[in-house]
Design a protein with these regions (language model features):
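Conserved beta-alpha
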Residues: 1-135
Length: 135
């Protein structure tokens, strides 16, 4: 029981509110402390954008909604829409998959059990099905 228990929630500067809201619903007193910021790294993404354009990437894997947001920020305006074929996207879980879908992109893999082991298993299963189709 967490009613009136003080909980220190250490998180990103712009966090998902699910945990905080869940704790507050059961009466916990939340102290929020942001300790890091999710922002795109300043590097040259030209190589990867070219890989996307030339359909040389089999999958794009996202492990968090902030990764999706930051990826979207590095894309030049209209880039995704200009791709000849949309790349396959895999997400660690349903919240990350929702972030992908919010941009209008399709998700091909998002395991029900949200951990890396099941994500890899999902990718292997999907790739096996694709291989069988083309044999």
């Amino acid at each position: 029981d967490l009613f009136e228990k003080r909980c220190w929630l250490i998180q990103a500067e712009s966090p998902r509110k699910i945990l905080r809201d869940s704790l507050q619903k059961i009466g916990a007193q939340i102290i929020l402390t942001p300790v890091y910021r999710n922002v795109p790294v300043e590097v040259d993404y030209t190589f990867l954008l070219a890989e996307l354009e030339q359909q040389k990437l089999d999958w794009i894997l996202f492990a968090s909604p902030s990764a999706v947001q930051n990826f979207h920020q590095i894309l030049p305006s209209g880039f995704w829409e200009s791709l000849a074929a949309e790349p396959k996207i895999a997400c660690l879980g349903k919240i990350t998959a929702k972030a992908v879908r919010d941009f209008g992109w399709s998700v091909q893999a998002a395991p029900y059990i949200q951990d890396f082991e099941h994500l890899v298993q999902s990718l292997c299963e999907i790739n096996s099905q694709i291989s069988v189709k083309y044999e």
